[in-house]
């Protein structure tokens, strides 16, 4: 599921985060931050979000059954200084058997969007949708069945890691050129989403330590 989440609802994310030259932490997953996060457009209901912590710090747990919604921030990230997104995440219950590049199966147990504003309206936004796939191999990518302005890119898969914490990294600047054919110097925001409104299945996932780095 994507529909117009990035294209039309990202403008509702009006929160900002601290930025420095070496590292940009996007989400702290604290009680204070959670109270201020904006929920994006809801699809047949809202994902349940629960804060928690472990030996490596704070995380947020997402649960969705036949529904979906996202949390996001508008933050200007200089990709010439910090082009790499780093994500630590885990999928406890995946969406086995769905066809993720179809409208009926376009759900993900975990996904992280990076968004670039490329025009004067929200409809012109471009996005890369980094996903924790339930059915595809790492490195696979395809346009969203709802809009070609968002590309799904598999960074993790439950075929290799189910109910296991995984840390991944991607060069966002290079990925925008490879997937969208555009050279971007910065991005405009980041959002997370767990959704199952198309498949009607249940997903449980966790997000932790999402930040941008120089290398």
Task: Annotate each predicted stretch with a short phrase.
Residues 29, 190, 208-212:
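Extracellular beta-strand elements of beta-rich domains used
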């Amino acid at each position: 599921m994507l529909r117009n989440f990035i294209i039309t609802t990202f403008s509702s994310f009006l929160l900002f985060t601290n930025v420095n030259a070496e590292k940009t932490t996007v989400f702290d997953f604290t009680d204070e931050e959670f109270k201020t996060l904006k929920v994006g457009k809801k699809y047949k209901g809202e994902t349940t979000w629960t804060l928690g912590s472990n030996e490596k710090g704070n995380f947020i747990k997402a649960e969705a059954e036949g529904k979906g919604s996202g949390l996001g921030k508008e933050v200007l990230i200089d990709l010439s200084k910090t082009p790499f997104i780093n994500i630590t995440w885990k999928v406890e219950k995946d969406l086995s058997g769905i066809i993720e590049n179809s409208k009926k199966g376009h759900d993900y147990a975990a996904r992280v969007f990076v968004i670039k504003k490329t025009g004067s309206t929200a409809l012109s936004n471009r996005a890369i949708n980094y996903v924790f796939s339930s059915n595809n191999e790492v490195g696979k990518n395809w346009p969203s069945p709802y809009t070609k302005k968002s590309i799904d890119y598999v960074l993790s898969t439950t075929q290799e890691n189910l109910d296991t914490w995984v840390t991944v990294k991607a060069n966002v600047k290079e990925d925008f050129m490879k997937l969208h054919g555009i050279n971007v110097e910065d991005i405009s925001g980041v959002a997370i989403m767990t959704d199952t409104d198309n498949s009607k299945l249940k997903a449980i996932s966790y997000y932790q330590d999402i930040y941008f780095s120089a290398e």
